[in-house]
Every structure is written in structure tokens, then in C-alpha cells.
Amino acid sequence: MKRFSCFFIWIFVLTSILPAQEREVKLKVVQTSDIHGNYYPYDFIRRREATGSLARVHALVQKEREAYGKNLILLDNGDILQGQPTAYYYNYIDTVAPHLAAEMMNFMGYNAGNMGNHDVETGRTVFDRWAGDCRFPILGANIVDTATGETHFETL
């Protein structure tokens, strides 16, 4: 057993001092921001098709994932919880179902997100529910709980 342990340690030391092989890795970072509740390519106010939406971003992300696979990093920079009637519905009417924004972002495979000023305006109950439904970290070192002085979301 002692010989085996010494051999294992020798192999570990030998492999840790050998130079690492150099190789090129390509990453693609896709970042969304200011979605403002435009989850679908439809303007519910004017009752007509709209040009932009999270659903259309998903089509782009799918193409990029084909090219980059797991080397695609998908991030959101906030301001997703206000703007269109669909957002308000999931913010204040249907408060039991998982939040639609979180469900779409989970489906799209977001790696991380953070809060925008308009997300904070929805109120703590809404943004806590959304963040709790997200299956990726919500970062926010500058969002501080005034009662405790602690950061409200993850910090790196």
C-alpha cells in the first residue's frame, strides 16, 4: 500500500510539473438586455406582429449553439420584468405559476443574469419569485438588503 501511495504521488508530481498543452478554445458570448417583457414577437398594445422578442433571440441562440456547443455563454443584463402586458400578467395576476420570463430563460439555457433598474421597480416579491424560478445564478453585488447590509443575490 505504501509503494502504491508513493507511486501515485510520484505520478501526480510528474504530471503537475509537465508543461500544459497549448490549444485554442473559441468562446461565444451572447448577451441580452432590456427585453422589457417582449417575450413574444407580438405587440399586445397595438395588436400586431413586433420585430423583436426573446423568442426571436432564441432562434439566434440555437444557431450559435450549433456552431459553438457548450462554448456559448448566454447572459442577461436585466430589465426583463416590465414593459408588455404578458410581463405584468406574470408579475401581478398569475403569481402561482412559474414566471414566464424565468421559464423562457431556463429553456434557452442562460448561464447567468442580473437585475436591471426596471426589474427592481417591480418590487421584491416579483423579482424574488422570478429569481427563484431561474435555474441559473442571478448576480447582483450592488443589490443590498438595507435591513441586514448583506447582498441580496450571489456575488463572485
Where are the model-predicted features located?
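Acidic, metal/ion-coordinating pockets
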Residues: 20-156
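Bacterial Sec-dependent N-terminal signal peptides
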Residues: 1-23
